[in-house]
């Protein structure tokens, strides 16, 4: 939790000429007594392509700071024209209002600044050498970008957690032994599983073949027994046996006629069971 909280910033002289001072009314709240002062700074970004043109316009130490809500006026000089490339004077740039405690920055407020001439003619056809006296600035005070940082204040308890955290055990194992170890274990486990599956398929196939062979042998033996029992030696039959069979056939035909008469007198009974059809 921050001991100092920024409540608001008002840009007082806006819009203004490029060479005029910057003025800010800053309001902040202090939650506990601080041992050191707050350092406020205003930085002008001279170029979007390189930070070598950045200028610290002014800095201010504020303190001792009482607990509660505090307000003050921060003034800063205009940037030095000689340190800004001519091509970077006109157009949009940025100013940064920052505050630090004991050399540790905890708040940063960024504003876009539009620099242009005060007449439409000069804006339509700007001269090669900028006319600084005719340039005006407009700070987009309604759209600041605020960034907060966690810092250590007076007590050790207020210090933020270190990032990344210390991991001394991570240095005990060489990177070559650490990286790829899990992948190697997974590949070995997959290979073992595939090998076990292939062995299981092979063993089950052998059992099926053996069972089929035994079954075929049993069927063949049964067929042999049936052929032996049902075989008839036609040549071994005697003429007497044949005559007896012919007489028996005659009697059977007579009996058959009687059976046909009996069956005609009795109606045939159906043995079919009703079948329900599921729709």
Curated annotation (Swiss-Prot):
Q: Give the family this protein belongs to, as stated in its UniProt record.
A: Belongs to the ASF1 family.
Superkingdom, taxonomy of origin: Eukaryota
Q: What is the lineage of its organism?
A: Eukaryota, Fungi, Dikarya, Ascomycota, Pezizomycotina
Q: What is its main location?
A: nucleus
Reported function: Histone chaperone that facilitates histone deposition and histone exchange and removal during nucleosome assembly and disassembly.
Kindly list the GO CC terms recorded for this protein: chromatin; nucleus
On whether Chaperone is a keyword of this UniProt record, the answer is yes
Identification of the protein by name: Histone chaperone ASF1
Region annotation (Disordered) maps to 179-279
Keyword flag Transport: no
What residue spans carry the Polar residues bias annotation?
A: 268-279
A Pfam family reported for this protein in Swiss-Prot or TrEMBL:
ASF1_hist_chap
**A biological-process GO annotation:** nucleosome assembly
């Amino acid at each position: 939790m921050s001991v100092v909280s920024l409540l608001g910033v008002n840009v007082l002289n806006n819009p203004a000429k490029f060479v005029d001072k910057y003025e800010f009314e800053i309001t902040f709240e202090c939650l506990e007594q601080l041992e050191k002062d707050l350092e406020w700074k205003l930085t002008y970004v001279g170029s979007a392509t390189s930070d070598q043109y950045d200028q610290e316009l002014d800095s201010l130490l504020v303190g001792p700071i009482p607990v509660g809500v505090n307000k003050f006026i921060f003034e800063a000089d205009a940037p030095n024209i000689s340190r800004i490339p001519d091509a970077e004077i006109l157009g949009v740039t940025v100013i940064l209002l920052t505050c630090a405690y004991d050399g540790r920055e905890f708040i940063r407020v960024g504003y876009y600044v539009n620099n242009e001439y005060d007449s439409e003619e000069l804006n339509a056809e700007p001269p090669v050498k900028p006319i600084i006296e005719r340039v005006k600035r407009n700070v987009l005070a309604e759209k600041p970008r605020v960034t907060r940082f966690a810092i250590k204040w007076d007590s050790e308890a207020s210090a933020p957690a270190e990032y990344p955290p210390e991991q001394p055990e991570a240095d005990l194992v060489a990177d070559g032994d650490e990286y790829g170890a899990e992948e190697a274990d997974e590949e070995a486990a997959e290979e073992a599983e595939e090998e076990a599956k292939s062995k299981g398929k092979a063993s089950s196939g052998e059992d099926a073949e053996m069972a089929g062979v035994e079954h075929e042998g049993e069927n063949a033996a049964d067929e042999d027994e049936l052929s032996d029992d049902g075989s008839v030696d036609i040549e071994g039959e005697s003429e007497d046996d044949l005559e007896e069979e012919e007489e028996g056939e005659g009697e059977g035909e007579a009996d058959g006629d009687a059976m046909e008469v009996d069956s005609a007198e009795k109606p045939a009974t159906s043995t079919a069971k009703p079948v329900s059809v599921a729709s």
